[in-house]
């Protein structure tokens, strides 16, 4: 009774296409893709900035411990 079959998924997909239309779904998909791409880019930028900051801290520590 609670199983999700291929037939049920196809019926739901057909209803979504009928309700929203292909143009709106295509636009929504493009917007979602752009949001995911922006999120991944921001995550990579944060990692790079954190690594660069750690390198600067390490260099400053080496300079301050110079005898």
Swiss-Prot record:
Entry keyword annotation includes Signal: no
Main location (coarse class): membrane
Mode of membrane association: Single-pass membrane protein
GO biological process: intracellular protein transmembrane transport; protein transport by the Tat complex
Organism: Escherichia coli (strain K12)
This protein's encoding gene: tatE
InterPro entries: TatA/B/E (IPR003369), TatA/E (IPR006312), TatE (IPR024905)
Gene null: resulting phenotype: Disruption of tatE affects the correct localization of multiple enzymes whose precursors bear twin arginine transfer peptides. Export is completely blocked when both tatA and tatE are inactivated.
PANTHER family, sorted: SEC-INDEPENDENT PROTEIN TRANSLOCASE PROTEIN TATA, SEC-INDEPENDENT PROTEIN TRANSLOCASE PROTEIN TATE
Entry protein name: Sec-independent protein translocase protein TatE
Location in or out of the cell: Cell inner membrane
Induction of synthesis: Constitutively expressed.
Transmembrane regions: 4-21
């Amino acid at each position: 009774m609670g199983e999700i079959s291929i037939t049920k998924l196809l019926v739901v997909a057909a209803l979504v296409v009928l309700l929203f239309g292909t143009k709106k779904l295509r636009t929504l998909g493009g917007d979602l893709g752009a949001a995911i791409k922006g999120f991944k880019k921001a995550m990579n930028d944060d990692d790079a900035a954190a690594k660069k900051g750690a390198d600067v801290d390490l260099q400053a520590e080496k300079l301050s411990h110079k005898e």
